[in-house]
């Protein structure tokens, strides 16, 4: 089924033509079509992602032909038991096309460990360093030979995955993973991951959300330029930068061409960026949930809802009250309006990328391009200060295009321009500290909450996420004020305390933490909390590197000697 036929099908469902959008990819198995619909709606698996991550045992044409015959026999209403048998006969379990990979550049005892004064934390950091070996993946040759038999996007070089259900690469997760890998002295692994991303830009014009074809039409927060900056700073590999500077520019062009919006403020028009994914149908990896959610809105609004869900996924915050700004009940996921918001963090990331590109081109001797990106950054900075900055509150806020005003709710992303260095007022870090105090954020002792609203979504209270801790901590650390610096350290201490406590109890790191009651693995959202976990490990290593001479494991836990901690960890692993 081509997407044109998909469009006709949607029209047959009563959707207006301007709302009938193309599917996320052409595959009639992994992205749209009757097979996907019947399998996912039958709920053969608890997690919708499981089916679309399974590879085919034979060609797609043969699978579709066999399915068509089965559907005809059952008048297109196949019983669950027969569907289960069909999938078991024609699909292979998740992960068959991947093999575990131990990075060749992994080694014992990287130097940063010596910076950590607390013996318990040093032993723990060694354990985190070892986890890289568990998260390494390499694609089998069959993914390249038979790409149509898998939803995986082929990557030439091995990579580090987040962990748990996420057995493929993810875009913005990889930045914090790479920071941790560089501390672990694994620059070769980082270079391979960077090369994979650069290859994706050359092939598709952008980096998809993750390494599956059903993610192809949406990206994630644009951190590729920053990844390159950290790699070059660590290795001095300017030749690699020079070879790929044009590809970095192409990725930023994708955001300029496809994700910009004009905003009028003070009688002047400004251009800023937003998340926007004009592709229809339920997300394949959350198909049943999206299809059922669509039943709660008028038929003609369903394609818009699905596109907004994809834009929310592109933001990395899937999902959050940040985007639930439409309709009478803002806590309902059906009120999502991601594309109607101008996000502070997205524009901060792009502002930072434009500054880095200017620096890169200067370093490479191309003054014309350096000036171009310097001017782009200046234009964005002016736009952000006019549209997103609130002097009275001392923070930046997402701008609601439909309501014509800022969303003044608390989110750590409100301080992302500070982290990105995208500001002109040198006292802004101290203003940000006052904003945190006024918002009562410093009263939370186990981490910075993702919001102050408990909607049941995973990117809201009471969850706390590693990348958002980083945005605030390193943002405040830019201040020259000793007090603001001290608060940055205390926030780092709080986060390390939570990570270490949970690890000591469960011998695992998690993608998110519930900071409402002493700190434990987070919840909410569309799936169970995942272990691993790439960016959590990366940030923990970053904070241990930065504040290793000050951080402590806590009074109660400090009574355990390092050998006791190791013994406890080994025992827990043996019992698993």
From Swiss-Prot:
Q: Which residues form the signal peptide?
A: 1-20
Q: Which molecular function GO terms apply here?
A: alpha,alpha-trehalase activity
* Aminoacyl-tRNA synthetase is among the record's keywords: no
Q: Enumerate the glycosylated residues.
A: 75, 258, 366
Q: Which GO terms describe its cellular component?
A: brush border; membrane; plasma membrane; side of membrane
Q: Tell me the membrane topology, using the record's own terms.
A: Lipid-anchor; GPI-anchor
Q: Which domain of life is it from?
A: Eukaryota
Q: What is its subcellular localisation? A: Cell membrane
Enumerate the UniProt keywords alphabetically. Answer: Cell membrane, Disulfide bond, Glycoprotein, Glycosidase, GPI-anchor, Hydrolase, Lipoprotein, Membrane, Signal
Q: Where is the active site?
A: 318, 511
Q: Identify the Pfam families for this entry.
A: Trehalase
- Proregion residues excised on maturation: 554-576
Per the record, what are the reactions this protein catalyses? alpha,alpha-trehalose + H2O = alpha-D-glucose + beta-D-glucose
Q: Which GO terms describe its biological process?
A: animal organ morphogenesis; trehalose catabolic process
For whether the record's keyword set contains DNA damage, the answer is no
Q: Residues with GPI-anchor amidated serine lipidation?
A: 553
Binding sites annotated in the UniProt record for substrate: 165, 172-173, 209, 218-220, 283-285, 316, 526
| EC number(s) per entry | 3.2.1.28
User: Hey, which family's this protein in?
Assistant: Belongs to the glycosyl hydrolase 37 family.
This molecule's function is given as: Intestinal trehalase is probably involved in the hydrolysis of ingested trehalose.
Oligomeric state and partners? Homodimer; disulfide-linked.
Protein name in the entry:
Trehalase
Originating species: Mus musculus (Mouse)
Task: Name the gene behind this protein.
Answer: Treh
């Amino acid at each position: 089924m081509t997407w044109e036929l998909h469009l006709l099908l949607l029209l047959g469902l009563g959707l207006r033509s301007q709302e009938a959008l193309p599917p996320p990819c052409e595959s009639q198995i992994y992205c749209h079509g009757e097979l996907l619909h019947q399998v996912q709606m039958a709920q053969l698996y608890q997690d919708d992602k499981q089916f679309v991550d399974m590879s085919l045992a034979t060609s797609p044409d043969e699978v579709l032909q066999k399915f068509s015959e089965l559907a005809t026999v059952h008048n297109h209403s196949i019983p669950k038991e027969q569907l289960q048998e069909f999938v078991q006969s024609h699909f292979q379990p998740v992960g068959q096309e991947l093999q575990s990979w131990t990075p060749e550049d992994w080694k014992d005892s990287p130097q940063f460990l010596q910076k950590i004064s607390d013996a318990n934390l040093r032993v723990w950091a060694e354990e985190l360093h070892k986890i890289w070996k568990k998260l390494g993946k390499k694609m089998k040759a069959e993914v390249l030979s038979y790409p149509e038999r898998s939803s995986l996007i082929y990557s030439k070089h091995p990579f580090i995955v987040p962990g748990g259900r996420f057995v493929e690469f993810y875009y913005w997760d990889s930045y914090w993973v790479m920071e941790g890998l560089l501390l672990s002295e694994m620059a070769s692994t980082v270079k391979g991951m960077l090369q994979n991303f650069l290859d994706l830009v050359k092939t598709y014009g952008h980096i998809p959300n993750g390494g599956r074809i059903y993610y192809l039409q949406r990206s994630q927060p644009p951190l590729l330029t920053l990844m390159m900056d950290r790699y070059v700073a660590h290795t001095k590999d300017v030749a690699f930068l020079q070879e790929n500077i044009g590809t970095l520019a192409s990725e930023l062009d994708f955001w300029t061409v496809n994700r910009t919006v004009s905003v009028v403020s003070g009688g002047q028009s400004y251009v800023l960026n937003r998340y926007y994914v004009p592709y229809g149908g339920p997300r394949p990896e959350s198909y049943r949930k999206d299809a059922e959610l669509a039943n709660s809105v008028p038929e003609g609004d369903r394609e818009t809802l699905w596109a907004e869900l994809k834009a929310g996924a592109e933001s990395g915050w899937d999902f959050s009250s940040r985007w639930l700004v439409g309709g009478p009940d803002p806590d309902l996921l059906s009120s999502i309006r991601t594309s109607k918001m101008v996000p502070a963090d997205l524009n901060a990331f792009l502002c930072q990328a434009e500054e880095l590109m200017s620096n890169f081109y200067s370093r490479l001797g191309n003054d014309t391009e350096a000036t171009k990106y310097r001017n782009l950054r200046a234009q964005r900075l002016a736009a952000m200060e006019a549209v997103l900055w609130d002097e009275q509150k001392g923070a930046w806020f997402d701008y609601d295009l439909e309501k014509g005003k800022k969303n003044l709710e608390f989110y750590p992303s409100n301080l992302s321009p500070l982290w990105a260095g995208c500001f002109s007022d040198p006292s802004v870090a101290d203003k940000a500290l006052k904003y945190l105090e006024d918002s009562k954020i410093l009263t939370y002792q186990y981490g910075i909450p993702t919001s102050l609203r408990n909607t049941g979504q995973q990117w809201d209270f009471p969850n706390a996420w590693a990348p958002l801790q980083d945005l605030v901590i390193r943002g405040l650390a830019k201040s020259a004020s000793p007090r603001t610096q001290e608060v940055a350290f205390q926030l780092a201490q709080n986060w390390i305390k939570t990570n270490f406590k949970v690890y000591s109890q469960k011998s695992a790191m998690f993608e998110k933490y519930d900071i409402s009651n002493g700190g434990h693995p987070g919840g909410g959202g569309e799936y169970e909390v995942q272990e691993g976990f790439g960016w959590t490990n990366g940030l923990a290593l970053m904070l241990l590197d930065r504040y290793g001479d000050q951080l402590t494991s806590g009074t109660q836990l400090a009574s355990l000697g390092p050998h006791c901690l190791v013994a406890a960890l080994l025992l827990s692993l043996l019992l698993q």
